[in-house]
């Protein structure tokens, strides 16, 4: 680091030289440099500003870098509210012009140029070079032997473009005429940033020699090179016109196609290519009739796999290469990156330093941006493409990743900003650095300063909350679209690098983005949190409360424009809000340590961290399989036509981005979109989601015996079921055959497995005939995981965390293998393998059921196998019966046995079954024993485990969509069922009889406490003094309202109401709160107006909703024409509104005293209870609701407005009313007496 200081510490930014507000003020002591005189403030363009149309591109930087190192004019956009001396009518909108001067920054009473490098800078700097000038101290010449690599880049260099005198001949040979260069980016133990350029890596692909010679009449490898060069020169465009045969090298090798056992070794041309672009073109276009192999493997993967031991994340050592050649240090003026030291070498100059496992002092940047719309509607959501919508503040926290220490807190502010003293004192009390407030006159200057910090400080890791989908896209769109700033030099590369965000499709209707920045690993904590934990809301405040037990001082979006316009002190409140967001995200980062698990996966899979984050599970398994296949003499084909489904054509190049992820449950739509019957449905059969097409039958479950079980239920789990099936039965591409004649020379059962899958006979040879590649991978991974886990107890706390992340990474990759084979459009699909795994899994469930029922049908049989069972006997008849089987779990209901005894002997029972039925390494384990179990349906149950802990699977007692009142009541009912023995006994008796019987008789006496909860709930719902906050429901806005097929959704109603009231409308992925109100005349009128607004919004082009000003008033609505059935005079009876039309914003309902719809809420409560407790009544929801209603007092409950009018008139309620169940009991006793 060449400038460790963060500049003068600014106490909240109170400075003599102030941004923006001072810029627009009359000339002060600083003279003309402070801005135009007051009389010129109205047009703002003189003396410095010119019309936008005359804007010229800033003077280009020097040829060796493309980042801004100098700038003397720029587009100036700033909000007029910063002109604090102007009258109110002049402070709306923005100034937009062109300014001729260097960009400025103000801090702590000082002013300086943003791009100037010198001592006492306002932010820390680690870059050695800036603008082609070496700023290293005299004598700086660090010795580099060992360095840690965290990112790997690749690019193509041309010999004619290089200065031969600067390069060793071996490097020139590697790029003559062109060649791929791999760049390793990392850090030394001393903290020096290193870039090592590795020459000589070549990509290659394979083609069958016999096919090539037959199609192209080749007699030697050189002939093939000539044919390929000719094909490239004849391709459209001028890209390949200079290609010659010297660009290629071909050799003949013996390899075997990985598909099918009967495939035998053959001769292949291995064609080396010097450019990935050429490779892609050849594989896609050169002789399509000839199959290509491994053409999609990038240069970085080749570098890692072709050099045994090399890793994408770990320690390397420089060493002498062949013929004692050494790595060549690069001269600073020839650096291509912003590193401290650069070397040129070949792969033989590198070795892995296996003895080091800790991380060097990498830097982490955590940032957050605040934006504000600048048009007529300041409450509109900002759009990056609108020049008037501005970034107003950026908080930036800089951590040392190895020590977790927060080293710098920076706040970039458009306009002057004074942080509150209370915030500064709070940070000081926590031992955190005092924030450095950097103030700017214009948005461009602030954004340029931020990007200059990114370049000069160069954090290796960056995090934030939803930065991939919002913060980075917004910033980059501003810089490129509005200010025309080239970004290719702002990563670690000084030019020709990558710094971009792009969309990678939709997941659960959410637009997903991907960011790639050379030398900067972006880890979005929003994605990490949504993957790791399940919450009802993923807003940062909700996550902080749930995970950190902390909460932030929230600032309403509606308040930001007023705070921003109010002056430096109120802008400081926004700054505090911005900083605390980054602080919370930093805490989340160091709680989950996502970089450790991601780097462990990257290291295991042989891919860099960025691919680990964005490219899904497929690429991880593919790369590992590629490595092993090469060792065993196999090659992997590129073609995807081998296992096409009935209806689809596989793409030539399947995207590897998350295509193997299972579709998540439609959160927010499972109830919300079905409410009015217009929700979208997924078709039956094979489904295709987010690039994943599954064309085979999934794992079978044994249908559950629904009901409430108060006898012990033992749950046996298969340990790593699918990986163990693959290992036990030697399943693989290479062991599969579809032809009986291919295995005719082998002995059935002994040498191969024969199995029928989907009506077709498949054959898999045993391991002694040919060992499965997938099995080898799994065996090695699991052995590695076992060894790592064994080291954890003896490790230091820091090392234990790292080891735990490593073993978790191995588990993730192991569990990806089955899915890897089952994705039809994946990188290497084999649906036969995937379908065989699930078929064997189904057979194992059935075999286990038959074995348990036959082997332990009588207690004496159980006693013979387990003598200790004599002490397990409980009162009542004995039986052992499987009541549910779910993919890898088996539920065994054990009557006449104690839960304690079953818990003690469970592992022995599981081992007994494993030995009797399954091949190793398949094994059953006793996971738990339920003392009580409410088995509702497949994958839905609630139970109490021996010891008292409750386990809930597939049943959301606390649903995101339900209100707090319903969630609390549902939980209270469940607790009663499981922890009140009287209620449990009554419920068990209830479940043993057919549900229809209870329609004609009273419910068991023991359910009275259960009914009391429902009675109390009914009372609270109908209480006029109830707290409305308890009845707030929420639903996620999963996409823009116009994109919904079903428009009759409650949360969409509230969205349009907010828009009509010019309130802040929610963003996509926000959860919209609402309450259901009673139908009144005012509500009916509002619904009519909303219908018009929906029509306007549906017709509006673009991404933004129609302006609220377009909403017609009720008086302008067309008069409805009376129908013949209407009463005379045309006055028709008001229709009953849909529930979704009765949705209202809770804040509005509270402020205006809008009455709630009590009937809806109680029906909703009964519906929620029925979903959980219908298992007591044979899963008959209609009977369940009918019986639960017996507990409700039979009284008339008028609407709230009617009840209020009755009370005002002096009427009062008479009697509490009896419940239907009480009435039924009285009548039952009366008839018994009369009888």
From Swiss-Prot:
Transmembrane segments: none annotated. The keyword Methyltransferase does not apply. GO terms for molecular function: 5'-3' exonuclease activity; DNA binding; DNA polymerase activity; DNA-directed DNA polymerase activity; nucleotide binding; RNA-DNA hybrid ribonuclease activity. It comes from the Viruses. It is found in: Host nucleus. Its EC number is 2.7.7.7, 3.1.26.4. Residues 662-675 have a biased composition (Acidic residues). Changing residue 646 to T: In strain: Nonneuroinvasive mutant HF10. It holds the Pfam family DNA_pol_B_exo1. It catalyses: DNA(n) + a 2'-deoxyribonucleoside 5'-triphosphate = DNA(n+1) + diphosphate; Endonucleolytic cleavage to 5'-phosphomonoester. SUPFAM superfamilies: DNA/RNA polymerases, Ribonuclease H-like. Changing residue 102 to T: In strain: Nonneuroinvasive mutant HF10. One of its GO terms (cellular component) is host cell nucleus. InterPro entries: DNA-dir_DNA_pol_B (IPR006172), DNA-dir_DNA_pol_B_CS (IPR017964), DNA-dir_DNA_pol_B_exonuc (IPR006133), DNA-dir_DNA_pol_B_multi_dom (IPR006134), DNA/RNA_pol_sf (IPR043502), DNA_pol_B_thumb (IPR042087), DNA_pol_palm_dom_sf (IPR023211), DNA_pol_type-B (IPR050240). Keywords: DNA replication, DNA-binding, DNA-directed DNA polymerase, Endonuclease, Host nucleus, Hydrolase, Multifunctional enzyme, Nuclease, Nucleotidyltransferase, Transferase, Viral DNA replication. Replicates viral genomic DNA. The replication complex is composed of six viral proteins: the DNA polymerase, processivity factor, primase, primase-associated factor, helicase, and ssDNA-binding protein. Additionally, the polymerase contains an intrinsic ribonuclease H (RNase H) activity that specifically degrades RNA/DNA heteroduplexes or duplex DNA substrates in the 5' to 3' direction. Therefore, it can catalyze the excision of the RNA primers that initiate the synthesis of Okazaki fragments at a replication fork during viral DNA replication. Forms a complex with the ssDNA-binding protein UL29, the DNA polymerase processivity factor, and the alkaline exonuclease. Interacts with the putative helicase-primase complex subunit UL8; this interaction may coordinate leading and lagging strand DNA synthesis at the replication fork. Belongs to the DNA polymerase type-B family. This is DNA polymerase catalytic subunit.
